From Swiss-Prot:
Disulfide bond sites: 52-65, 61-70
Propeptide position ranges: 27-43
Localization annotation: Secreted
Signal peptide extent: 1-26
Molecular function (Gene Ontology), one example: toxin activity
Tissue localization of expression: Expressed by the venom gland.
Function according to Swiss-Prot or TrEMBL: Reversibly blocks N-type calcium channels (Cav2.2/CACNA1B) in rat dorsal root ganglion cells. Elicits no toxic symptoms in either vertebrates or invertebrates during a period of 48 hours post-injection, when it was assayed in vivo by direct injection into mice and cockroaches.
Record's protein name: Hainantoxin-X-2
Length: 71
């Protein structure tokens, strides 16, 4: 009986440690992904009047690229 209880407690402890490791790993990668995300770059859009080159540029216009100028 004591062996069964010990086995269950040990299994729960191992499970808790694995959850902690996975959570820390996921949090670390989510911060890295957030820094590299194109969505972050979209929010930094070019202001109106700046030259633009259509869909191939790294940082898009805040509005629309029209006649090679952001509007």
């Amino acid at each position: 009986m004591k062996t069964a209880i010990f086995t269950v407690v040990l299994a729960l402890a191992v499970f808790a440690v694995l959850c902690l490791v996975v959570s820390t790993h996921a949090e670390r990668h989510s911060k890295t992904d957030m820094e590299d995300s194109p969505m972050i770059q979209e929010r930094k859009g070019l202001p109106p009047g700046k030259p633009c080159y259509g869909a191939t540029q790294k940082i898009p216009c805040c509005g629309v690229c029209s006649h090679n100028n952001c509007t």
